[in-house]
């Protein structure tokens, strides 16, 4: 039960859809009870990738061909529990037997990467790296922006009293990530993006205003985020990073439930706003100065894939296959 359901908010969403009480999803019920509740609704997920994945896992790891249902849930529970014990099926065992050669986590620039350091000291079949995710430094309108800058300052061991100093601190942390895990990828989440022209002086003023808790206009937010993504892309380029843009994130849609059970528990969605023009201007401005890094765009809205693919194809580069891709 724990192997299947702990932290798996995709399964949690399905269970909520079929009216399962939250007690059996994120609540204090035992993992055995949660597993039995999940078995009740799994047959109704035919057509959902989760149904296919569950069948694949039962076959691949336990050689079980029967579909899991409420009727055979106890029998399958007993069989799998016995095999898990006999084969010592740890997380590492599962990754190795699935021939997983590389896993990437995603971490904030302030993370000390202590667990990555520990993994580096062990000989593992699977290599573990991390993506560099600086979102909290981009969201200048957030109430905790100043507090986050203080944490970033401590992690980078330098003062941050300006936008320029913040960029220096982020680059130091990016290089630290590269040193510890060998990573060469970013992970930038963009719920909304509209390119807005700016001057360095304007951005410094916006930074100071945000840091002091001032209320920003939407235009100021657009200017700051334009400058942030532009300068971070330049940092990625000179450090040979691939820039990954997750576009259209709509987090915590059900705020009352998020307050009750926490973030990343199955209440994130995709927005239908496709800032193609804004991202296009970002890519164009980077191309103009010859500093566009390799870029992967992840549009969360599946209906806009064609639009994004056409944009990506417009930024080819001599000698580089699909420099911008989906």
Which functions belong to the PLM regions below?
Residues 268-280, 301-309:
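A general structural motif
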Residues 1-239, 291-309, 313-326:
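Metal-cofactor-binding active-site regions of metalloenzymes
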Residues 282-288:
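Short, basic/hydrophobic alpha-helical segments
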Residues 258-266:
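Short glycine/proline- and charge-enriched loop/turn segments
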Residues 258, 289-290:
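Acidic/His metal-coordination segments adjacent to aromatic residues that form catalytic metal sites
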Residues 252-255, 305-306:
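Flexible glycine/acidic-rich beta-alpha junction loops that bind and position SAM and/or redox cofactors
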Residues 1, 242-252:
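Histidine-centered catalytic micro-motifs
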């Amino acid at each position: 039960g724990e192997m299947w359901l702990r932290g798996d908010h995709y399964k949690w969403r399905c269970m909520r859809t079929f009216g399962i009480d939250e007690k059996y999803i994120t609540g204090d019920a035992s993992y055995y009870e949660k597993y039995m509740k999940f078995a009740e609704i799994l047959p109704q997920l035919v057509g959902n990738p989760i149904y296919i994945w569950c069948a694949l896992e039962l076959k691949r790891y336990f050689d079980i061909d029967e579909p899991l249902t409420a009727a055979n849930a106890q029998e399958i529970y007993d069989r799998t529990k016995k095999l898990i014990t006999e084969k010592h099926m740890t997380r590492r065992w599962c990754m190795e037997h699935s021939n997983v050669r590389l896993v990437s986590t995603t971490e904030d620039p302030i993370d000390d990467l202590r667990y990555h350091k520990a993994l580096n000291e062990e000989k593992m079949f699977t290599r573990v790296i991390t993506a560099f995710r600086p979102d909290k430094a981009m969201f200048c309108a957030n109430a905790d922006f100043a507090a986050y800058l203080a944490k970033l300052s401590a992690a980078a061991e330098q003062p941050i009293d300006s936008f320029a100093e913040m960029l220096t601190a982020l680059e130091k942390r990016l290089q630290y990530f590269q040193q510890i895990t060998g990573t060469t990828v970013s992970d930038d989440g963009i719920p909304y993006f509209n390119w807005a022209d700016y001057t360095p002086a304007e951005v410094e003023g916006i930074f100071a205003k945000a840091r002091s808790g001032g209320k920003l206009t939407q235009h100021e937010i657009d200017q700051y985020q334009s400058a942030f993504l532009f300068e971070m892309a330049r940092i990625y380029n000179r450090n040979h990073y691939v820039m990954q843009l997750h576009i259209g994130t709509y987090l915590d849609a059900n705020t009352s439930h998020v307050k009750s059970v926490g973030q990343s528990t199955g209440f994130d969605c995709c927005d239908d706003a496709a800032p193609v023009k804004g991202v296009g201007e970002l890519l164009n401005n980077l191309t103009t100065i010859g500093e566009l890094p390799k870029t992967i765009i992840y549009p969360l809205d599946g209906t806009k894939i064609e639009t994004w693919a056409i944009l990506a194809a417009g930024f080819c580069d001599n000698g580089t296959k699909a420099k911008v891709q989906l």
